[in-house]
């Protein structure tokens, strides 16, 4: 069973989660405007998981699946930095001991630095707290 087939099987237990799929990818659609998309791709060197503009590559299928599930949980938040209306940086934060802690970030090299920055926080609450996987 491929990782995509595994995800589809696990997501089927959550009919409220909407997603689109391709042969080597799956993308969960945010539940509303306060959420963010979560994607999973099989690539030649392993797997890529993305939360909107943020992304990370994995060689371990289990780690990639865990990261994907984390993006659907209330323990994950995405801080999106905008300059004007342009999204320029995405910071993945995790909830630890009641505090949001930055884990990883992805940003654009070229951005409209002359525009003032603001932060939008986006969060999915599609899985219960502490669920390690989309089971």
Regions from the PLM with identified roles:
Residues 73-135:
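Acidic, proline/glycine-rich low-complexity IDRs
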Residues 1-15:
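Amphipathic alpha-helical segments
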Residues 33, 41-48, 72-76, 97:
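Short, solvent-exposed coil/turn segments at beta-strand boundaries
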Residues 12-16, 70-76:
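Structural alpha-beta junctions
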Residues 51-59:
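A short, exposed loop/beta-hairpin motif centered on an aromatic-Gly-Thr core
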Residues 60-72:
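A short, charged, amphipathic alpha-helix used as a generic interaction element across diverse proteins
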Residues 25-31, 48-51, 89-92:
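Generic recognition of long tandem-repeat/solenoid scaffolds
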Residues 15-45:
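Amphipathic, interaction-prone secondary-structure segments
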């Amino acid at each position: 069973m491929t990782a995509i087939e595994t995800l589809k099987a696990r997501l089927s237990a959550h009919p409220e989660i909407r997603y689109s799929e391709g042969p080597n990818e799956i993308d969960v659609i945010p539940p509303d405007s306060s959420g963010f998309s979560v994607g999973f791709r099989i690539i030649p060197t392993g797997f890529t998981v993305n939360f909107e503009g943020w992304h990370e590559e994995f060689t371990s299928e289990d780690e990639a699946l865990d990261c994907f599930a984390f993006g659907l949980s209330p323990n994950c938040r995405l801080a999106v930095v905008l300059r004007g209306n342009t999204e320029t940086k995405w910071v993945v934060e995790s909830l630890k001991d009641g505090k949001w802690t930055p884990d990883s970030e992805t940003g654009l090299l070229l951005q409209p630095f002359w525009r003032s920055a603001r932060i939008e926080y986006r969060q999915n609450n599609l899985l219960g707290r502490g669920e390690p996987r989309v089971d």
